[in-house]
Swiss-Prot record:
It comes from Bacillus pumilus (strain SAFR-032). Keywords: Hydrolase, Magnesium, Metal-binding. This is Nucleoside triphosphate/diphosphate phosphatase. Its cofactor is Mg(2+). Signal peptide: none annotated. Gene3D superfamilies: FomD-like. InterPro entries: DUF402, FomD-like_sf, Ntdp-like, SA1684. The lineage of its organism: Bacteria, Bacillati, Bacillota, Bacilli, Bacillales. Its EC number is 3.6.1.15, 3.6.1.6. It catalyses: a ribonucleoside 5'-triphosphate + H2O = a ribonucleoside 5'-diphosphate + phosphate + H(+); a ribonucleoside 5'-diphosphate + H2O = a ribonucleoside 5'-phosphate + phosphate + H(+). Belongs to the Ntdp family. Mg(2+) 1 binds at N87, D103, D107.
Length: 176
């Protein structure tokens, strides 16, 4: 598996457990890429849904992917603070085309005061049944949801107070 290079622009591709494409973010600038972690950033990038509909993101975002965690984190810079959208997902894979992961439906929305809501539990239950998620996957996803909530409470990793601002500053160097 090759890793994207710092400064390179690449897609992010989200799939479902059945292998079908879920969503594509057209352009993300790579800020850091190692075998353990990829950090990227985008601002007003085109997103294509599985049904072909498109929309544009509204604000700058820092995207955090970890090779050993079954979640990824998007920190969105808004006027009233940093909001986070966390996808419970497979660890990332990369190729020359994109950062890729399997989206497992459960999401966590985190507000600037670090309170959060767990989203899409009904969708997770439906897809778990429809796509026959193995018990092992269900167990891993629940464990990593708990890890994610711990990271939020501890302000660890992408939830650290300076994390999003620091990486956004680096992103600005590529947009000049």
């Amino acid at each position: 598996m090759g890793y994207p290079k710092e400064g390179e622009t690449i897609q992010i591709q989200s799939y479902k457990h059945n292998g079908l494409i879920h969503r594509i973010w057209n352009e993300t600038t790579i800020l850091k890429a190692t075998e353990l972690c990829i950090i990227g950033a985008n601002d007003r990038t085109m997103v294509t849904e599985s049904d072909g509909r498109t929309w544009m993101t509204r604000e700058p975002a820092i995207c955090y992917f970890h090779a050993k965690q079954w979640f990824n984190v998007i920190g969105m810079l808004r006027d009233d603070g940093v909001y986070y959208y966390c996808n419970i997902s497979s660890p990332f894979a990369t190729d020359e085309e994109a950062i890729k992961y399997i989206d497992y439906d459960l999401d966590v929305k985190v507000f600037p005061d670090m309170t959060y809501n767990i989203l899409d539990e009904d969708e997770y239950a439906d897809h778990k049944r429809q796509m026959n998620y193995p018990k092992e996957i269900d167990s891993i996803l629940r464990e990593h949801l708990n890890t994610l909530l711990h990271w939020i409470h501890q302000r660890k990793g992408p939830f650290a107070p300076e994390f999003v601002d620091m990486w956004y500053e680096r992103f600005l160097h590529y947009t000049k």
